[in-house]
């Protein structure tokens, strides 16, 4: 699944570890999501969007 999570996270100055802790997953899970190797659940997508203060569209559907 292609997404903007890494771009948005880095722009916000947040590490994978910090984001993972905020949403209740491992750093490895965040890495897999960013690479497109893991399809997160809707609830995890929402948690990531809230943590990064972005919409689901901005993170997962409007890929730049």
For each predicted feature, which ranges?
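Recognition helix of helix-turn-helix/homeodomain-like DNA-binding domains
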Residues: 26-38
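Short amphipathic helical patch at the helix-1/turn junction of helix-turn-helix
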Residues: 10, 38-39
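Short, charged recognition helix plus adjacent turn
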Residues: 13, 50, 60-64
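Key DNA-contact positions within bacterial/archaeal DNA-binding proteins
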Residues: 17, 28, 57
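DNA major-groove recognition helix of helix-turn-helix/homeodomain DNA-binding modules
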Residues: 43-58
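Short basic helix-loop element that most often maps to the first helix and adjoining turn
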Residues: 4-22
């Amino acid at each position: 699944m292609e997404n903007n999570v890494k771009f948005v996270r880095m722009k916000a100055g947040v590490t994978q570890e910090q984001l993972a802790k905020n949403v209740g997953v491992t750093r490895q899970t965040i890495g897999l999501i960013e690479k497109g190797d893991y399809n997160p659940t809707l609830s995890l997508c929402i948690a990531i969007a809230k943590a990064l203060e972005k919409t689901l569209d901005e993170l997962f559907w409007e890929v730049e």
